[in-house]
Amino acid sequence: MKYSKKWSSLFLASALTLSTFSIAQPQVQAAEVEKPTKPTNVIMLVMDGSSNNAVTLSRWYKGGNLAMDEILSGGVRTYSAESAITDSAPAATALATGHKSNDKFVGVLPATVSSPGLEQVAKEDAFKPVANVLEGAKQQGKATGLIATSEIQHATPAGFSAHATNRSQYDNIAEQQVYQNIDVVLGGGSESLTPGTTKNARKDGENLVNVLNEKNYDFVKTRDELLNSTSSKIWGSFAPSALAYDLDRAKTRPTEPTLAEMTGKAIDTLKKDEDGFFLFVEGSKVDWAAHKNDTIGIISDILSFDDAVKEAVDFAKEDGNTMVIAVTDHGNSGITMGNANTSSTYSSIPVSAYIDPLKKATMTVEGALSQLKEDKSNLVEVAALYGLDDLTEDELATLKSAKDIGDEMVKMLANRANIGYTTGGHTGEDVFLYSYGPSKITGLVENTDLAHSMAQFMGFDLNKLTDDLYIPATKAFKDKGYTTKIDLADKENPKFIAQKDDVTFTIPVNKNTLIYEDASTKTTKTHTFDTINVYNGTEFYVSKKVLNVIK
C-alpha cells in the first residue's frame, strides 16, 4: 500500500515532521513523545462543522472565556483527497486513520486522489479498509469509548469505529460498531439497531439490541439510567435519530444527557482500565445548525461542546498522562460577525448589536419549529421563541407564506444580529487546533497528522495495524488451496465462503467471527477475532489472525 507510507518511517524516527501530505508546507513541530510512567489515555473531541468565526461569536455570547481557549495550540488543514472542501466522512477518515479519502468514504482508502501533494493510491488498494486509532487502542488492551450527539452511526463517529464505502450505510456501520466491542457507546441512532419500517431501521432482520444484551452491555435509554449505571460496558441510545440541541433539551427532551455528562460518565468508566483508554467525543449538531445558517443552534452546541472539553481537560490535568485533542473537522456556512449591514459602520458597532438580538432566543430554529401547531396558529409565539419577538407586518406575512418557515426565520435573526453567511455548505478554511497534555501538538498541521500523533502516543503504527487487521480474504484462502466465493443470495447479509475437500469456512459480513465446518467429522466451530470482517463491494477483508486457523 503506497498511500501515506511516509508516516511509517517519519514517526518511528521522531515526532517532529508533520504536514507530510502537502507540497511546500512549512515544517511543523510536535512535542517529542515522553515515555509514559503509567498507561496513556487519549481523548479526541470533534466539534463538527464549526469554524473560527463561530467560536469567536460563541465566546462573545457566553460573555467569558471558553475552556478551549486555554489549550489553543495551532491550526489544522482540512482538505480531502479530491477537494479543497471536505465532507465529514473523509474528514473523519483522515482524523481517525491518517489517510485522506473521498466524499462519502468512511475508513477506507480513496479511489480518486487529485489534491496537490498527495501520493496516489495503488489501484488494487482503492476502497481498502484502513485501521483507525480506536482499533489500535483496543489492540493495546485499552478501554475504548465513542460519543456523539447525532446518530452514533453518523459519518464522524463512524470514521472512528467502522469501514464503509458510503456514509449512508447505517446497517453496516451499526453492526460493525456492535461487533467492535467498544466499551462505552453513547449517542442517538437507536432505530439502526433493530428492524422496522423507519428510514434507518435495519433491513437485514438482525436485532442488535439483543446482541448487546448477550454481550453484557448495560443498555440505557435515559440520562438517569446512564448516570446510575455501574457497568464497565455501557451502550446508551437516547433517541431514534439525533439528540436535541443543547438549548432545546430542557423543553423538548429532558431525559437526554448533555454532551458533558456523557463525556464525564465515559471518562469515569473507562479510566478504571489498567491499560488506559481512548475516547472519541463529537459535538455533532454544530454542523447541522451551520448548514441551516441557524446562528442560535451553532452557539448552543459550541458551548455544549466546550463544556465537554472542560470535562476532558480537567481529567487530564489530574491524571497527568492523558493527551487531549479538540478540533473541528471542517468549516461550514462561512459565518461572520458583520454583514452587508455593517459595511460602512463596522468600526463603531458595539458587541451588543450582535449579541443582544441573539440573547432573545430561547430555542434553536429546530426547537422552535417543534412547537409549531399544524394550523400555524401560534406562528407569532414560535417566532418569539427564536428571538423574533417584534415581527413587522411584512415579516409575519413572509413567514406565513414561506415554503420553509425555518429558512426565513434564520435569515431574519441573522439580519437583526448583523451576522453574515456565505453558504449552506462546508467551507475550506484552516481551523483551530486545541491540544493538552503529553506530546501536545503545535503549529499548522494536516488533519491526518493528528491520527498518527495519537497512535504514536499510544504506542502503535497505523500502517502496520492495517496490515494486521485487514487482509484480503480471497488471497488468504486461495493461497491455502481453497476455492472461494462471495455469497450475495441475501443482499443484506453477504458472506464469504471458502471450501476445500470436506472443510468449509464461512465469514459473515460486519461481525468478528469465522465459522469452521468439517463435514467428515461433523464438526462446527466459531472462531472470534480481534477485528470485524469488512466487505467493500468487491472483496472481504479479515484479520491476519485468520491465517492461524486455515488448514
Residue locations for each model-derived region?
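Cofactor-binding active-site loop characterized by glycine-rich and histidine/acidic residues
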Residues: 12, 29-36, 84, 92, ...
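Bacterial N-terminal signal peptides that target proteins for export
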Residues: 1-11
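Sec-dependent signal peptide cleavage junction
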Residues: 18-34
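Active-site-adjacent structural elements in enzyme catalytic domains
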Residues: 38-40, 44-49, 53-54, 59, ...
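Secretory targeting and sorting signals
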Residues: 9, 13-20
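A post-motif C-terminal structural segment
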Residues: 40-41, 50-55, 60-93, 102, ...
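Extracytoplasmic mature domains of secreted/periplasmic and thylakoid-lumen proteins
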Residues: 100-175, 181
